[in-house]
């Protein structure tokens, strides 16, 4: 049977939505019989934007906005075709960005 190593990277602006998605991926993988490493928490990235409230005067009056990006990594060290099919049929919310990286194709 061909086994592969799979890395699933999740990104979202909402940490609760991200944690629910990671939990559903982990439960689906464990039901299929996979060994799961993670979720591994990455530091959140905060982008800050500072703009003037007025269009051309009053430099002291400013408004601050920020975007927080949360990231998680889930690793499946030995995934086979049944696990991949189970993960493909999983429905995730629209606010979560998913990147899947498949490594290897060794005979195990």
Swiss-Prot record:
The gene is rpsJ. This is Small ribosomal subunit protein uS10. GO terms for cellular component: ribonucleoprotein complex; ribosome. GO terms for molecular function: structural constituent of ribosome; tRNA binding. One of its GO terms (biological process) is translation. Part of the 30S ribosomal subunit. Keywords: Ribonucleoprotein, Ribosomal protein. Involved in the binding of tRNA to the ribosomes. InterPro entries: Ribosomal_uS10, Ribosomal_uS10_dom, Ribosomal_uS10_dom_sf. Belongs to the universal ribosomal protein uS10 family. It comes from Ehrlichia canis (strain Jake). Pfam families: Ribosomal_S10. It comes from the Bacteria.
């Amino acid at each position: 049977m061909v086994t592969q190593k799979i890395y699933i990277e999740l990104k979202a602006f909402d940490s609760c939505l991200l944690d629910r998605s990671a939990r559903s991926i982990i439960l689906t993988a464990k039901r299929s019989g996979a060994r799961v490493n993670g979720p591994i928490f990455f530091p959140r990235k905060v982008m800050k934007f500072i703009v003037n409230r007025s269009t051309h005067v009053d430099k002291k009056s400013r408004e601050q906005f920020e975007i927080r990006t949360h990231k998680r990594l889930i690793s499946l060290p030995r995934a086979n075709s049944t696990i991949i099919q189970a993960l493909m049929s999983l429905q995730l919310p629209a606010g979560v960005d998913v990147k899947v990286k498949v490594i290897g194709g060794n005979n195990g």
